[in-house]
């Protein structure tokens, strides 16, 4: 397997791809993940995200096998706000919202008492245009906050209030 970054000055995410056509199958990737789990855990902690790119993952079932190889204690109790479609026991669509409806930067289910430790994303059908999964290292966002603000968050906590307009509301003034 080879490792690289999408750009020289950004180490999020760490990209891992197969060295050759023989190393790009789902079964090879599952075995490699199982054999290298502790190193992958360290890399995930260091970089914040790992992108497995160019592997032969063709179905939600294939993707679930990859996720289970990395974490055999997956959860499937989705409590988010975006409409989702269940594909397998542990794989859901990212959103059933129309493509013109943006999904803003967020910390997935951070409003829960115990937010997910890990998230796995998979692109089954690549969009003809656009399409994105923006990622952000919120550890850096936290470190960039003014220390006084961080202290307030730590002492007082955070209250989440979500105000969403419906997907069919095209008004830019809807809050």
Which residue ranges define each predicted feature?
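Non-heme Fe(II) oxygenase catalytic core, chiefly the N-lobe of the double-stranded beta-helix
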Residues: 1-175
């Amino acid at each position: 397997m080879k490792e690289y970054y999408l750009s020289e000055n950004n180490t999020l995410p760490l990209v891992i791809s197969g060295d050759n056509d023989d190393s790009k199958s789902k079964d090879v990737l599952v075995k490699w993940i199982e054999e290298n789990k502790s190193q992958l855990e360290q890399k995930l902690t260091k970089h914040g995200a790992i992108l497995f790119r160019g592997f032969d993952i063709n179905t939600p079932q294939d993707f679930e096998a990859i996720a289970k190889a990395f974490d055999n204690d997956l959860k499937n109790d989705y409590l988010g706000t975006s409409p989702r479609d269940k594909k397998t026991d542990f794989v859901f669509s990212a959103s059933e919202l129309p493509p013109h409806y943006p999904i803003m930067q967020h910390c997935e289910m951070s409003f829960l008492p115990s937010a997910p430790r890990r998230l796995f994303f998979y692109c089954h059908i690549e969009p003809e245009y656009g399409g994105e999964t923006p990622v952000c290292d919120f550890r850096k966002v936290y470190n960039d906050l003014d220390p006084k603000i961080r202290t307030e968050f730590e002492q007082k906590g955070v209250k989440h209030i979500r105000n969403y307009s419906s997907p069919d509301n095209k008004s830019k003034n809807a809050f």
